[in-house]
């Protein structure tokens, strides 16, 4: 009887500690290029999801390089795509020039969740360590346009406009984002937590400075902005933390490791010279060889501790508690 109670107790403890291992998956299909799944392409699996879907629909993608473009339409919410790992499952395409038409992966739907997969736009991306000689143009790896969407251990690989964080509330956790120019852009209301931001400045040539973010907040009442919490910024060459794509651009780096890849000036007003007071760019509690702010642009705001805490908190994106309702846990 004593042994029986101990076993039951351990089972209960495991269930409490590891909720992510016992997620309910009411609808599930497998994508496998070898033909041993339900589909051989991710897009065909997405196509199988009913219009106006109301239940979490899991698409498990086996390891491999998938040469395809993927779109989740607006009327197909509640899709979960799970790969075998950022380095094992990779989706790659090479459209370019048109920002709107180039994304390798695009979701227009609310409640999109992705885990353990990499989306790459290969048009300008270096191959086997060699500089890519294609003319540099916008070439998007991923477009995120729906609300209440989350990305766990996802890779985004490109050079210019890699991750188009367009609109809606988004949560990125332990993701890797690679690029050189405006490679995290858009008007999303997003938290990037424990992510790796890798600057690939070698693609720009000697002495050319890149830009990590190009945030597009258009007026003072907009709730959107990019918040980076406990992130690592590293790589090669030099890059500004951000430049203003729109007149009320807002980006915060909080408790993050900024290496010397960060240009000492830090931020650029771009087309909004004379309107710098409208921009909200801040660094709080950051460390590392590129975190010294003594040479930052003089117009950069000094936010109060309470203002920083408001932005650098999950509540910034989590109205309604949608993050806790996701079928995948951190």
Curated annotation (Swiss-Prot):
Q: Which UniProt keywords apply?
A: Aspartyl esterase, Cell wall, Cell wall biogenesis/degradation, Glycoprotein, Hydrolase, Secreted, Signal
* Cross-referenced PANTHER family: ACYL-COA THIOESTER HYDROLASE YBHC-RELATED, PECTINESTERASE 10-RELATED
Attached carbohydrates are found at: 38, 52, 257, 292
Is Secreted among this UniProt entry's keywords? yes
Q: What is its EC number?
A: 3.1.1.11
State the similarity comment.
Belongs to the pectinesterase family.
According to UniProt, this protein's pathway is: Glycan metabolism; pectin degradation; 2-dehydro-3-deoxy-D-gluconate from pectin: step 1/5
Q: Which Pfam families match?
A: Pectinesterase
Q: Which reaction does it catalyse?
A: [(1->4)-alpha-D-galacturonosyl methyl ester](n) + n H2O = [(1->4)-alpha-D-galacturonosyl](n) + n methanol + n H(+)
Name-wise, this protein is Probable pectinesterase 55
Record-level GO BP terms: cell wall modification; pectin catabolic process
Which residue positions hold the site described Transition state stabilizer?
160
* Top-tier EC class: hydrolase
- The protein's superkingdom reads Eukaryota
- An example Gene Ontology molecular-function term: pectinesterase activity
Q: Which residues form the active site?
A: 161 (proton donor), 182 (nucleophile)
Q: Where in the cell is it found?
A: Secreted, Cell wall
